[in-house]
Every structure is written in C-alpha cells, then in structure tokens.
C-alpha cells in the first residue's frame, strides 16, 4: 500500500475559543473539538508527526477548555497503536517553557509523565524566552503545516511565520471567535477575490 503524502509531515494545530459563549457556543466548541480529535486520529494513522506546546489548560466560565493543546496530547497518547510501526520520529516535538511543568493540568499529568520520557517525544525548551512570540517562533521552526482553529492575534502571528517560510497554513471555519481575527480572518482572506483558488 502506498504511503500517504502526510507521512512524516509535522503538523501544528493551534487556536483557541473566546470567553463569550454567545459567540463561541457550546455546540460549536464541541463540534470543533470533535473535529480536531478526528483529525489527529487520521493524521496519526497516516504517519504524520506533530508540534505541540506544553502549557496550562485554561477553561472558560462554562468549563470549556480555551485551547486545543491538551486535547491533541491526550488523543495521541491514547491512540499510539494507530501509528504505523515504521513511521518516522520523533512523533511529537514538545515546546515548553521553564514555568510550564508546574502549569500542567492535574487531569493530564499522567499523559505528560508518560509522553515526556517516551522516545517518541523530543522536548524543545524555550526557557530563555519569556515572550510568547519567541516561543511561537520555536514552534514554527519545527512545523511543516499549520492548522488554525479559532484563535486571535497569536494565530495570525504563527500564520505569518509559516507563510513567510513557504509552509502551508490551513484555517478551519469554525465560529469560535470574531470574524476579524484568527482562523476566521485567514479563512475569509483565502476565500475572497484573487486569493481564492477554486
């Protein structure tokens, strides 16, 4: 069976939801999270690899996680058997800051403890940078493809880094924030006028 074109490509899934549940409804957040999980499972089965930050898991007032990072970590950890035996490594490049160890959510501590000692994970420290933009630069250096889900200025910053390096940026069209920023803005830009390839 021929290998997928995704085999060995390193994917970086990034984004967030807004605090306002009237903008990012529970139903839309659930739909986005289910999509991200299914996407990670599919990529994993096709031999793809990942860049994932190690950070806190902040929740909205209604309990919805604001970011997708720990969903990606947990999905990979729970489905390692789906990965082709001959897939290239490392499976994950984990980008962390010296403060992050203490910020790992209790419910994902066992996931991190197992993954951080695995030969499937390469840890890249951004400990010398306190600025989020510098940590994003480290992430972008390792990724091949950026997939954006919601988000805001951070998503736009990462998208520029990937674009400037000639790497694909794939914005997903979920209603997780204002249309004027993040993946929604990128999606609208890509679909408008001469930017769209139909």
Predicted regions and their residues:
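Acidic/glycine-enriched connector segments
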Residues: 3-10, 15-198
